[in-house]
Amino acid sequence: MYPHSKQKKTPVTLLALSIALALQAGAAAAQDAGAAATELDTVTVTGYRASVEKALDIKRGEAGMVDAVVAEDIGKFPDSNLAESLQRIPGVVITRDGGEGRQITVRGLGPDFTRVRINGMEALSTVGSSDGQGGTNRSRGFDFNVFASDLFSQLIARKTASADVEEGSLGATVDLRTARPFDYDGFTLVTNVQTAYNDASQAAMPRFAGLIANSWADGKVGALLSVAYSERETVEEGTGTVRWANARANTPTNTANPKGVGFAGCAEGTAPFPGVCSDQVYTPRFPRYTLMEHDQKRLGVTGSLQFKPSDRTTFSLDMLYSKIDAQRDEKYIEANGLSKTGADGKAQIVVRDGVIENGALVYAKMDNVDIRAENRHDEWSTDFYQVSLDGEHRLTDSFTLSGRVGTSRSKHDNPVQATIMMDKLDVQGYSYDYRGNANKPVFNYGVNPTDPNGWTLSTIRLRQNYVTNEFHNGELDFSWVIGPSFTLSGGVQGKNYSFDSMERRRVGNETAVPNFSTGNKIVPADMTELASLGGLAGSPGTWVVPNFGAIANSSVSSTAKGSTHWSTTRPACAASRSRTAAVG
């Protein structure tokens, strides 16, 4: 519940009250003219209004377009990470992954156009995700879900160019600042413990944040330590299409099929449903149900030491470490044949009935459709650290020197990304229907999706991803206040950036799968498991998928074509690597 207050002001009453107070003050001054003035204690106002005032002060002090979020806002709103804190800035939109904000878009420009500085030093952090959310990040887009929002005291988005901000951003330059001991008055201890319960995953999600700070030697030396830890278990249930494609993408020209128009029979002639042959008709590529289970743990630690030998000089040493560990399981059941352009895919499908709306085949009943069930398992982690030292010295009342030097490193490891697929070929009576609710279509697979018998192993996909980003920064600046309305600033900056990316894949064709011990590729029933949707109306509720553990321990794992061994932890792979270094 947000705090609120109601006030009613009557101008006449307030005027009368102010006149009365003025008369009393005049009388008191006449009676106590010789008395010494009494100094009152300082009254500090905190709360939402105070945080807004601080943000406005930041905006007033900048010549460009700047928006800010300060500590009071960050701490009092339940933002799980930095992206969700930044989305409260006008013009900032976030993308989500696993139920959390991941990247930001500023004024329509995507993550690649936004540059991020932490304590004044440019940095980059990357994570992995499902293919539908962008997969492993090898771009310059910053993944904010590496960091808990509790670790930062100030977020600033600079939306316009400025001479004192180096180039590299068309969208915005986002400045993140961690807390420092001199931000607090003496000894400070703050703790925050929260928990939530997710009824979809049936799991508690604890969250803890703590900060301790103190200063000594009459405020000349200070130290601070903050820690944030959280756990999340989420379940996502839904549907997808993996885009829509032209029904005649493979342009077959066979004669019309009198039993029904198939994608291989799109030609002149009379048929029960000829409309599907139009070049302007689109069909879903992978109409499917989706179940995603995402578990993650995130730890963040900041430390800061400050030294102020005089009123004119301040040194600050800031340290930041964050680690996120995640495990994701994705299970799908889909019509795979609609995406195939070969003879065993779209060309063999026969369309029995359909409905076209606005150029889309929103309902179709088909024969000879391949049905696919797949199971994907990911394990990944990202470690980020940054160390920076900065100092400021006022040589005179009008001339100030400042400088900083630091380094940062983000290391993303995805040692396990394994996908197993199995198909049921040439299924009769398959249908999909997007007419009632395009977000909740109804699929009828023509077979019992929970029956583990008759599935053919079709794909074993084993991949590993590793991405490392490093920054080394240094700068020296000066500021000279020439007059009340004129300040001259300048400086020099050096930056070195290096990028290392590697992807390893299973040797050979991923669709070249070996036989089981039975002598064929039919998946044994005891090497399958069930996936269930809990709350998606109109879905089959449960379907069968490959079982990772059972298949990895079977004869398939030791006879996969092109490799001598594969498992969900250390697949035999071919590697590709890229390196980039930049100096500025």
Could you tell me what each predicted segment is?
Residues 128-130, 232-244, 284, 316-348, ...:
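Outer-membrane beta-barrel and related beta-rich outer-membrane complex signature
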Residues 44-77, 103, 121-126, 130-136:
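N-terminal periplasmic "start-of-domain" segments of outer-membrane beta-barrel proteins
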Residues 1-38:
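Cleavable N-terminal targeting peptides that direct proteins into the secretory/outer-membrane pathway or into
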Residues 172-178, 194-195, 204-215, 285-330, ...:
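Outer-membrane beta-barrel transmembrane strands
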Residues 83-130, 159:
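Extracytoplasmic beta-strand/coil segments of soluble accessory domains associated
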Residues 134-142, 150-157, 164-260, 264, ...:
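Outer-membrane beta-barrel translocator/receptor signature
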Residues 115-117, 154, 188-192, 222-224, ...:
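Residue-level detector of the transmembrane beta-barrel scaffold of outer-membrane proteins
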Residues 250-284, 346-369, 430-458, 513-584:
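Flexible glycine-rich, low-complexity coil/linker segments exposed to the extracellular/periplasmic environment
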